[in-house]
Structures are given as C-alpha cells and as structure tokens.
UniProtKB/Swiss-Prot annotation:
Residues 25-233 are annotated as: Interaction with GRB2, ERI3 and SYN1. This is Major prion protein. InterPro entries: Prion, Prion/Doppel_b-ribbon_dom_sf, Prion/Doppel_prot_b-ribbon_dom, Prion_copper_b_octapeptide, Prion_N. The gene is PRNP. One of its GO terms (cellular component) is Golgi apparatus. The lineage of its organism: Eukaryota, Metazoa, Chordata, Craniata, Vertebrata. Residues 1-24 form the signal peptide.
Length: 256
C-alpha cells in the first residue's frame, strides 16, 4: 500500500513538472525575418539603394524586360518567357510553377508495393475465417539431421513461405494449439496457391516446409503474446483512478 502511494506521488510530481515546462511559450524575437534589410538585387527596393545601375524595362543586359540574356522577357536563357529549359512559357525550372519553386525538393514517390505489403501484414485475410497474415520473416536456419535434407533446404528455401497465417493469441489456451493451427493453415494456403501456378511439392518439400513454418509460427506467437500483454498492461495503467485524475488535470491545464 505504501509503495502504491509513493508511486502515485512520483507520478504526480512528474506530470506537474512536465506540464509546467510544456506551458512555457517562447516569445517571438523582435525584428523581421531573414534578409529584412532589403534585397541586394536589382528592382527590389533596397533602402540603401541598389548596387547596380538603374535599368529600364529589364535586368542587366536586357533590351526587352526579361532576365539576363533574354531578348523577350523570360527566365535566364529563355527566348520566349518560360522557365529555364522551357522554350514557350511556363513556370520554374522543369515545372509549371513560379520561380520560387526552383529550390523545392521533389516529393518522394510512393511505392505501391510497399504500401500493399504494409497493409497486408497483420490484416485479416478475407475468406479465411478471421486469420491474419503476419509480417515477412527471414527463413530460419534449421538442421534436419542429415546432409541430404540440409542441402535440399538450402537450395530450395525460396520456395517456402516467409509469412504465416494465424488467429489472435487470445483465442488459444496455449502455444501448442496456436502453432498447430498456424502450421496447418499456412502450409495448406501455400501449397494450394503454388500448385495453381504449375509448381508441385514432393514429400520432402512438405516435410521440410512444415518444420520451417513451425519455427516461424513459434516466432509469431511470441511476438503476438508480448504485444497482447503490453496492451493489457497499458489498459490497466490508464484505467486506474489516480492516472485518470492526473490526465484530466493535465488536459485542463493545456486547454485552459
């Protein structure tokens, strides 16, 4: 009981200190942003005057109001008013926007294969009665007790699955039941899917595959069990009255 009170007081002090630091707001520094003293380039109104001679319609060396070396009002090296490398109008360099976009990095392209793989991992597989597909694993290194099977596995491991099908661990009373069910559904699905592609498995393949999948299912059970207990511990922690009171007080301080 004493330890519980001590832990509650420590948590209260920690949250109070954290909230005090989080509520401190930085005051903006006086002055403007970068280069507020005026531009050093032509035609931009520097208070101290430009360092270049006054120009009529265009920039330095421009007869017709364009950028440097432009006869007809475009960007640098543009004959017809477009971005650099664009002969007939447009935006900034290599794109249809303004010149302010020249230095913007291009947006990374989304790899749809990675998105699909991330969505499939841990998701419920349709048509399999609530089974989920685990994340990809490295195939385990297994010794089968004889040189022939060891060599056969090394040469053919790419033909065996690197993901397993499983149900949530809370549906099983122990690890053995989870692993047994996981092995059966994974081997069945892999053999059926691969057979439809014209590839057949021998008895040696099935024997080795069952051993490999068994090790992967054990690993999957350990991962799921650890995550399950962590979720349970988090629920117990945040459902206790002292923690609820402290969280409510913290929200009040932030919102207020």
């Amino acid at each position: 009981m004493v330890k519980s009170h001590i832990g509650s007081w420590i948590l209260v002090l920690f949250v109070a200190m954290w909230s005090d630091v989080g509520l401190c707001k930085k005051r903006p520094k006086p002055g403007g942003g970068w280069n507020t003293g005026g531009s050093r380039y032509p035609g931009q109104g520097s208070p101290g005057g430009n360092r270049y001679p006054p120009q009529g319609g265009g920039g330095w060396g421009q007869p017709h109001g364009g950028g440097w070396g432009q006869p007809h009002g475009g960007g640098w090296g543009q004959p017809h008013g477009g971005g650099w490398g664009q002969p007939h109008g447009g935006g900034g360099w290599g794109q249809g926007g303004s010149h302010s976009q020249w230095n913007k990095p291009s947006k990374p392209k989304t790899n749809m294969k990675h998105v699909a793989g991330a969505a499939a991992a841990g998701a419920v597989v349709g048509g399999l009665g609530g089974y989920m597909l685990g994340s990809a694993m490295s195939r385990p290194l297994i010794h089968f007790g004889n040189d022939y099977e060891d060599r056969y596995y090394r040469e053919n491991m790419y033909r065996y699955p690197n993901q397993v099908y499983y149900r949530p661990v809370d549906r099983y009373s122990n690890q053995n039941n989870f692993v047994h069910d996981c092995v059966n559904i994974t081997v069945k699905q892999h053999t059926v899917t691969t057979t439809t592609k014209g590839e057949n498995f021998t008895e040696t393949d099935i024997k080795i595959m069952e051993r490999v999948v068994e090790q992967m299912c054990i690993t999957q059970y350990q991962r799921e069990s650890q995550a399950y207990y962590q979720r349970g511990a988090s629920v117990i922690l945040f459902s206790s009255p002292p923690v609820i009171l402290l969280i409510s007080f913290l929200i009040f301080l932030i919102v207020g």
